[in-house]
Amino acid sequence: RPFLSKEFPEAAMVSEWGEPDKSLQAGFDMDFLLHFGPSHYNDLFRCEEPYFSSRGKGSAAAFVEKYKESRKKAGETGLICIPSGNHDMDRLARTLHGDELKVAFAFLLTMPGAPFIYYGDEIGLRYVENLVSVEGGYNRTGSRSPMQWNHSVNFGFSNASPEKLYIPTDDKPNSPTVEDQMADPASLYYEVKKLIALRRVHSALLSDGDIEFVSDGADGAPLAYIRSSADEKILVIINPADKEAVLEVPGIWNESLYTVGGTVKAENGKRIISPKSANVLR
């Protein structure tokens, strides 16, 4: 790392350990959480009852506890990153759908660390079921299908004969494309763009901003945290469940910077949080 920092100061080393409290101390600039190991990352998106499912039966508490522990151990040596997915995981859209994906991205793009968006997750690209394994992909093969740009041959990915593609496209009805989502202001694609723009203009939401959890999302409860920098403090409240929630939050947060799925109302010193919503307040 000293050599890289000296010779290529704008480069960064990213590990694939999934244990940032170890990898950052070993010299990497950043590490991203994985679907195995001690992080409880799967509790959020990829388990029988993920926290971001609108059924509201999941819990983020174990993830939050381990995340705080990892940040404490890592100190300021590097970034702990939370990816939307990668080539070894089930697609995010295999377990989450519609508004659930929008709320999940609100979390991913307001947390510390460098955002990692696996290609296609920003349009809800689906896991392609029942594919023959390609070069040792096995059940991971369905997460490696081509990007889908439009409705031309092979969804705009290639003009080759479909049978010559390395992995087939998702040919089922309502298969998402970039073209369709760019034409729809209510699409997941546009929501992700809004969140990226929000992150870029608020120092508290940048990769190295601090975080303090107000609610750990235990047993389907809202997940709430305060992001802060030297210039500002921002409150993020996330309620993936399909029912209204009530939360006590310290401080005065009157300015809405972002909302999806419904707003947060102040009432008798508490916050009334809309179902399937994410809100960013200042």
What are these regions (language model features)?
Residues 265-282:
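C-terminal beta-strand-rich structural cap/linker in extracellular carbohydrate-active enzymes
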Residues 53-77:
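Glycoside hydrolase catalytic-domain groove-lining segments
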Residues 147, 245-249, 271-273:
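Generic detection of short hydrophobic beta-strand segments and adjacent strand-loop junctions
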Residues 4-12, 18-19, 23-27, 31-35, ...:
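Loop/helix patches that line or flank the sugar-binding groove of alpha-linked glycan CAZymes
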Residues 34-42:
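The catalytic "switch" region of P-loop NTPases
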Residues 244-262:
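Beta-strand-rich binding/interaction modules
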Residues 43-48:
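Extracellular glycoside hydrolase catalytic/binding regions
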Residues 237-238, 264:
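A conserved amphipathic helix/loop scaffold
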